[in-house]
Amino acid sequence: MPSVSPAGPSAGAVPNATAVTTVRTNASGLEVPLFHLFARLDEELHGTFPGLWLALMAVHGAIFLAGLVLNGLALYVFCCRTRAKTPSVIYTINLVVTDLLVGLSLPTRFAVYYGARGCLRCAFPHVLGYFLNMHCSILFLTCICVDRYLAIVRPEGSRRCRQPACARAVCAFVWLAAGAVTLSVLGVTGSRPCCRVFALTVLEFLLPLLVISVFTGRIMCALSRPGLLHQGRQRRVRAMQLLLTVLIIFLVCFTPFHARQVAVALWPDMPHHTSLVVYHVAVTLSSLNSCMDPIVYCFVTSGFQATVRGLFGQHGEREPSSGDVVSMHRSSKGSGRHHILSAGPHALTQALANGPEA
């Protein structure tokens, strides 16, 4: 997040995009909110490194096109072609919406730079969309991981909290919390940047990363138990690859931005040009998450693939979902239990591999 030294931008230095420091204008001596600095970072980068700015804008253009197509298709399938709105589907729909928001905010970034430089109102949609997407994406990725853990490892005890109404309440809380955090950060003009950076980094990034890492490890341990049948090996491998891919994408997309926040807070004398370049590269990596989420959570699942093939007139055999497997287990045993682990390794692996259908 951007900051400059107390001397202000007139000192000839490019502002650091870090968490929070006091910024004063030469004319009035008033503190400037961080949002005012975010709105002008493109001008700073273009004036210092025009080639890099053009390259990053080309990448953002590709992200916009790919994200619009993938997320638009995902939103249509999950909202219009998926009848069972399970908790996983609800979390995935909200994740797709956040990715669409950041994609739709990118054209505003081009328009602001070329046609409305210095217009804070014009820059607001992009700045708000970016930070809201980052906060919501982290939280919804965490929700999806926790939901997969409950469905696979704790299906019996989590039956009550894995209801659609509960998932909708969680999503509403995520949107409100992310919006409040985003607006408060953009309006910050105070001091004590180190304390705020560490607090935000722990709450926004390290805590969700810890939850995702621990629950991913627990799920992989459950999938790796010796009793798995041979015919379930292919689905088990696919499920493990999905979990690792989710964790890797989370690290690649969100770690650089938060690591840079902490680095600038601990090293306030970091060269301004270095800080500016690292900030823009980290923002680009974070935006890349908006067109990678549909690939991980939608196209990897067999149910989504079958629906997309049906839309394009290509019919293929669809694997039974985890709900089908559990229902078959109930009818054969007659016990009325939903415990996926007791339904066998094949059902356990499908519960993860079918993702939003479970």
From Swiss-Prot:
<dbReference type="InterPro" id="IPR017452">
    <property type="entry name" value="GPCR_Rhodpsn_7TM"/>
</dbReference>
<comment type="function">
    <text>Orphan receptor with constitutive G(i) signaling activity that activate cyclic AMP.</text>
</comment>
<keyword id="KW-0472">Membrane</keyword>
<dbReference type="GO" id="GO:0004930">
    <property type="term" value="F:G protein-coupled receptor activity"/>
</dbReference>
<feature type="topological domain" description="Cytoplasmic">
    <location>
        <begin position="147"/>
        <end position="168"/>
    </location>
</feature>
<dbReference type="InterPro" id="IPR000276">
    <property type="entry name" value="GPCR_Rhodpsn"/>
</dbReference>
<feature type="transmembrane region" description="Helical; Name=1">
    <location>
        <begin position="49"/>
        <end position="69"/>
    </location>
</feature>
<feature type="transmembrane region" description="Helical; Name=5">
    <location>
        <begin position="197"/>
        <end position="217"/>
    </location>
</feature>
<feature type="transmembrane region" description="Helical; Name=4">
    <location>
        <begin position="169"/>
        <end position="189"/>
    </location>
</feature>
<feature type="topological domain" description="Extracellular">
    <location>
        <begin position="260"/>
        <end position="275"/>
    </location>
</feature>
<feature type="topological domain" description="Cytoplasmic">
    <location>
        <begin position="70"/>
        <end position="86"/>
    </location>
</feature>
<keyword id="KW-0807">Transducer</keyword>
<feature type="topological domain" description="Extracellular">
    <location>
        <begin position="1"/>
        <end position="48"/>
    </location>
</feature>
<dbReference type="GO" id="GO:0007186">
    <property type="term" value="P:G protein-coupled receptor signaling pathway"/>
</dbReference>
<feature type="glycosylation site" description="N-linked (GlcNAc...) asparagine">
    <location>
        <position position="16"/>
    </location>
</feature>
<feature type="transmembrane region" description="Helical; Name=6">
    <location>
        <begin position="239"/>
        <end position="259"/>
    </location>
</feature>
<feature type="topological domain" description="Cytoplasmic">
    <location>
        <begin position="218"/>
        <end position="238"/>
    </location>
</feature>
<feature type="compositionally biased region" description="Basic residues">
    <location>
        <begin position="330"/>
        <end position="339"/>
    </location>
</feature>
<keyword id="KW-0325">Glycoprotein</keyword>
<dbReference type="Pfam" id="PF00001">
    <property type="entry name" value="7tm_1"/>
</dbReference>
<keyword id="KW-0675">Receptor</keyword>
<protein>
    <recommendedName>
        <fullName>G-protein coupled receptor 20</fullName>
    </recommendedName>
</protein>
<feature type="transmembrane region" description="Helical; Name=7">
    <location>
        <begin position="276"/>
        <end position="296"/>
    </location>
</feature>
<keyword id="KW-1003">Cell membrane</keyword>
<feature type="region of interest" description="Disordered">
    <location>
        <begin position="315"/>
        <end position="339"/>
    </location>
</feature>
<feature type="topological domain" description="Extracellular">
    <location>
        <begin position="190"/>
        <end position="196"/>
    </location>
</feature>
<comment type="similarity">
    <text>Belongs to the G-protein coupled receptor 1 family.</text>
</comment>
<dbReference type="GO" id="GO:0043235">
    <property type="term" value="C:receptor complex"/>
</dbReference>
<keyword id="KW-0812">Transmembrane</keyword>
<feature type="transmembrane region" description="Helical; Name=3">
    <location>
        <begin position="126"/>
        <end position="146"/>
    </location>
</feature>
<feature type="topological domain" description="Cytoplasmic">
    <location>
        <begin position="297"/>
        <end position="358"/>
    </location>
</feature>
<keyword id="KW-0297">G-protein coupled receptor</keyword>
<feature type="glycosylation site" description="N-linked (GlcNAc...) asparagine">
    <location>
        <position position="26"/>
    </location>
</feature>
<dbReference type="GO" id="GO:0005886">
    <property type="term" value="C:plasma membrane"/>
</dbReference>
<feature type="topological domain" description="Extracellular">
    <location>
        <begin position="108"/>
        <end position="125"/>
    </location>
</feature>
<feature type="transmembrane region" description="Helical; Name=2">
    <location>
        <begin position="87"/>
        <end position="107"/>
    </location>
</feature>
<keyword id="KW-1133">Transmembrane helix</keyword>
